[in-house]
């Protein structure tokens, strides 16, 4: 059976209704029973409670919950309560960020027309769009939403905006004639689709599909079956949590074995090992990562990128492929006049000579044979027509003034079948001289002229004369060949071309279609939606950063390729293909070719998903931009879905991870830079936290091996983890951005946070902190270098160890600022948040160990000035030690 767009309107009626007659009431009822309501199916939604519970799936969070339970069993209710509060707060933050992530189907429903004009009992009546059924005849006019998919049976200049479905920016001129052969969605001119919008004309269509069977319904099905990808950070943190738990268990196992060998009871040894495991886990890590990402979202929002899903902030830093829409993202989304072809030569739009009669005549004609206007700064009408009046304004010629002086006395509206538009204007005064001069006759006041514009091939068949600098003469085949060649040249460069002609008519003549003959050819005007000024630089930065930019558009291949060449995405024509080519490829073949294709034109939603999957199957992290309903499934399939804030539909926004408030490709590149920096900063924060915890574990291990008292009370470790550690860790997450990161290739998606080099840094920091803390503990425990009356004690040793561990970690924050030795350079001062966190941390720890009255709260012995100086001095040594290690590592690596 033929597709409906391949059938005539009569064949379509017979195929659906069995005859050309409208549906009877009985047939309407039967069809409603058979096809159901014209509505999208309800998708299963997650409740807020489900979303909240999902926040506890991360492995590290599970470990923390177990740690809290163990702490409670051991009687350490303080630790258990703090841990549970921290992970609950983190879950609340995550829930707030994701609670709106599944609204796509709701937005699709909003696109449906609430009412439609349908033929019932021989008359068109308004009914709710949900009551429309297959076989109904629906009337459309300008301003209507199309309520269902259907075959056009009557067309009077119908123009439909299908950009939400096809991605094509310009309105589509509809045609009631059948189409031969296969045609992509955007080229099925005799069809209309649910969710599109009528911008001009009127028509009637036969409903062929409703509800989930419409093109929008198919997209809804794709959207509901498309699984969201986990971001690299989500996978990394999960992997990190598993590895961290294994490391902690290994250490605790060692400690348990040592304790048993020393003769301690197995039960006591086990409880001590579990307590150490609780202390080793960085309780605030999840919250710190969430807070750092939240700060990142605020910065990106100021730079026109709104993050809807928090983990996407970091995921941007892993992006290796950006699949971008063309219109409005890489281009300005505004048609602009590029060239004129008049009296046999091409002229750039800005170079029009207003004193040249032929050039001025073409400019006037384009503004008069034109229905667009500008009201309160808003352009009204077809984009190609607004481009024609905008260039006039730019050159100092007001369309309002010209239209007032050259009143329209008649018109033949544009018709997609004949592809022409004509107006009859009464032209007088100075303007009449341009036309009368062309006709080599005396100027006459109030002469009527027919001005015609349209497709080049159609207009050339209707002209018999041509305007030249020497006047009007008969047009020759050579003239037509030159005009056709110029049109071909414009088209090959992705330009949209209109031809203009005119002729003198009798005063008061009511124009008829037959009058569009024997015209005088005046010239051509080419237009395009030009690239954004910043697109070329942004594409170049992508390539430098090892990111592959890919254009995916519903527009024609020639237009897409021309833009892609201008901005650097496309170097060779072989790198461009159309959706029909993808249909001929298996998924495996597409994976093989995807590296070599930079431009995809005339693509469907299914094509977009296949393209994204092909890149993902090759191990890439893919960002996908889109603004239409047709983009939503691919946005959801992509690792990072990027919706347009200005032109984007609610559907695309709800399916996305990020929304661009300026619809600008350069903003995506800036967001990638932010993502890379945030990932680096999060690693610095993790390095800072784990170095300190590792140092604490080593100190406890040392004390256990040598049968010394436990150096730390539980309150000490909680104080450090939740107070003096959290703020520096957050501050490290706010380190200033480093532009040089955009000179590096994207990191592999499966790269673990805990690389060998990263573990070495954690180890070096932990050992350094351990040494300084152990020395402080021994000084206090044995009473070395202390006043005789103070003496040594386990409590003093514990206090000095606590103070040194805390201050060492505060100083270590400066070590973690960079992989390079920068502490003794000016860069140490470039993070005001870290300096503030250091100062606050120093105040808090000093109060805890030196303020009388707080000793019982923190289980310490109040220190005097000598002991304080010892603590500060030992802690500071951590900086030169780690900086020396970095310098040695850097020198070795340089060899």
For every predicted segment, state its role.
Residues 724, 798-813:
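Generic alpha-helical transmembrane segments
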